[in-house]
Amino acid sequence: MTVVIDKEESMAGTASETADSRGKLVAGAADMIRRRGLNATSVRELAKYARAPLGSTYHYFPGGKTQLATEAVTFAGDLAATLLARELDRGPIEGLRAFLQMWRKVVVDTGFRAGCPVLAVAVEDLPEAEGAPREAAAAAFGRWTELLTDSMCAHGAERAEAERMATLIVAAVEGSVAMCRAQQSAEPLDRIAAQLEPLVRSTITRDRT
């Protein structure tokens, strides 16, 4: 019996497999960066970590480590933004709680061995010619801040005040994630959670009184 394979289906399958393999490498890079930092992450080590041939890794990322790191940071930033946006649909308090819980789960579930890959790249001393990962980190922070700002504005906050509050949230969360790793404890995140929620409530109700 002769099986005829439709050319478009075959190409679609190959494209899907390629995208899947590439996506795994990007996710693997994000995981390595959040554990080791950018300077300690090489394309060769990533290939071993992801159990991928070194040649295919360079094929997917001809720009080398800089391209891979940039895409990994974008991937991590988008992942967090997607969760945050979904929960913010229920309101700024719910979004804040989910954002905090997401990072708490990251540090606790990894035994405090992993943090935020966006922060890890943001604090690296990168050559000016290799600044794309840092730019991706800035974009991720900006997107999270904008999502929080828009949600608070939609619930009654004045925009300038909402922007300040959103910046405080992102800065506090990122800093406390680093503290959690250093102290091997989730207490820093728990402490800021207790402080941030009433501040957000005050921000969204201030203009209603």
What are these regions (language model features)?
Residues 119-120, 159-179, 191, 195-199:
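Hydrophobic alpha-helical segments that form the core
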